[in-house]
Amino acid sequence: MSDTATRVQKIVVEHLGVESDKVTQE
């Protein structure tokens, strides 16, 4: 996963309060 996607994932996790493994785009 690209660095940008990682940053987006982190933001989504912080805003939605979901687990990171549910947001992975692999």
Curated annotation (Swiss-Prot):
<keyword id="KW-0275">Fatty acid biosynthesis</keyword>
<comment type="similarity">
    <text>Belongs to the acyl carrier protein (ACP) family.</text>
</comment>
<comment type="function">
    <text>Carrier of the growing fatty acid chain in fatty acid biosynthesis.</text>
</comment>
<feature type="domain" description="Carrier">
    <location>
        <begin position="2"/>
        <end position="26"/>
    </location>
</feature>
<keyword id="KW-0596">Phosphopantetheine</keyword>
<keyword id="KW-0443">Lipid metabolism</keyword>
<protein>
    <recommendedName>
        <fullName>Acyl carrier protein</fullName>
    </recommendedName>
</protein>
<keyword id="KW-0276">Fatty acid metabolism</keyword>
<comment type="pathway">
    <text>Lipid metabolism; fatty acid biosynthesis.</text>
</comment>
<dbReference type="GO" id="GO:0005737">
    <property type="term" value="C:cytoplasm"/>
</dbReference>
<keyword id="KW-0444">Lipid biosynthesis</keyword>
<dbReference type="InterPro" id="IPR009081">
    <property type="entry name" value="PP-bd_ACP"/>
</dbReference>
<dbReference type="GO" id="GO:0006633">
    <property type="term" value="P:fatty acid biosynthetic process"/>
</dbReference>
<keyword id="KW-0963">Cytoplasm</keyword>
